[in-house]
Design a protein with these regions (language model features):
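N-terminal metal-binding scaffold of metallo-dependent hydrolase/deaminase domains
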Residues: 1-49
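Conserved beta-strand scaffold positions in the cores of enzyme catalytic domains, especially
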Residues: 5, 54-58, 160
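Divalent metal-coordination and catalytic microenvironments
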Residues: 9, 32, 37, 61, ...
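Short loop/helix-cap segments at secondary-structure boundaries that form the rim of catalytic
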Residues: 44-53, 242-244, 263-264
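Metal-associated gating/positioning segment near the N- to mid-region
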Residues: 59-117
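Metal-coordinating catalytic core of metallo-dependent amide/deamination hydrolases
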Residues: 100-119, 123, 131-237
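Non-catalytic positions within long, well-ordered alpha-helices that form the structural scaffold/packing
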Residues: 126, 191, 220, 243-246, ...
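Active-site-adjacent C-terminal substructures of enzyme catalytic domains
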Residues: 225, 235-292
Length: 292
């Protein structure tokens, strides 16, 4: 067994109300014992264990907090969308059009490029305090490209999400139902060994609520856990579909109604807010405050 004692902590945030009666559970002048990578003890520095400690780290009065959890990332991609970002900053409309450009770049990228790009982003997240991270597919949109994206992602995190239903790719624009059949059939079967979650972009320019329900239920029938991109571009039924299916989360939720908020408040579904996507649209922050 390996044991590490972090001592001389100015403030330790435990998220255990038993310590100070608040949700943060702050302990002043604290210590933390880690055994085999797992927190084994937390408490006042004066009460810290002293036996069988193989490593001691002096926090020098700094704060120690739980690691950040990033539950929504799109790391499996190639290329960039700087032109789209510029357009959005100039106030031009966005209806998920930039996704198609990234799909083209991702399909043409090697496994090595996808892996190194994702690893670089992952390292950056870890260096900023993230300890648990989710990675989605969704920029391949073919059976092979979605499978290889998730196969690579699974080597980087335990939390992988199948997002074959990101948008309908250009080759299926005239027959979107055929793409839904592909996602719920051969594509789903191909990615099953490499994913835990299934996600759908249920919004304007992406998938209707009926198609989203069909796709999510197909994944759930195979043991995947549901989540959604919902109500990013306009109000719709995505949030309430997430509640209906007991989804782990509905993400973005930039446009929500009172009915959406009421549905969320009585459910187990978490609303994941992504404020970085709203920089060009500051007026939308008001609706986010209602969700909070």
């Amino acid at each position: 067994m390996t044991s590490t004692l972090v001592h001389n902590i100015g403030q330790l945030v435990t998220n255990d109300p038993a310590h100070d009666g608040t949700k943060l559970g702050v302990i002043d002048n604290a210590a933390l014992l880690i055994e085999d990578g797992v927190v084994a003890w937390a408490g006042p520095d004066a009460d810290a264990p002293t036996h069988h400690i193989k490593r001691r780290l002096d926090a020098k009065g700094r704060a120690v907090i739980p690691g950040f959890v990033d539950s929504h990332t799109h790391m499996m991609f190639a290329g960039d969308r700087s032109k789209e970002f510029r357009a959005r900053m100039l106030g031009e409309s966005y209806t998920a059009g930039g996704i198609a450009h990234t799909v083209e770049q991702t399909r043409g990228a090697s496994d090595e490029l996808l892996r190194s790009n994702a690893q670089s982003l992952l390292n950056e997240a870890y260096s900023s305090g993230t300890t648990t991270i989710e990675i989605k597919s969704g920029y391949g949109l073919t059976v092979n490209d979605e499978r290889r994206s998730l196969e690579i992602a699974q080597t980087l995190t335990d939390e992988t999400t199948f997002l074959g239903a990101h948008v309908v790719p250009v080759e299926y624009k005239k027959n979107p139902k055929d793409y839904v059949d592909l996602v719920t059939g051969p594509m789903l079967d191909a990615v099953l060994p490499f994913t835990k979650w299934i996600d759908v972009f249920c919004d304007k320019g992406a998938f209707s609520v009926d198609d989203a329900r069909t796709i999510l239920k197909a994944g759930m029938a195979k043991g995947l856990l549901p989540r959604l991109h919902a109500n990013q571009l306009q109000e719709g039924q995505g949030v309430r579909l997430g509640v209906e299916l007991d989804a782990a989360s509905v993400d973005h939720v930039s446009h929500v109604s009172e009915k959406d908020i009421e549905a969320l408040s009585t459910s187990n579904t978490v609303a994941t807010l992504l404020p970085g996507t709203l920089f060009p649209y500051t007026t939308l922050f008001r609706s986010r405050k209602s969700v909070v």
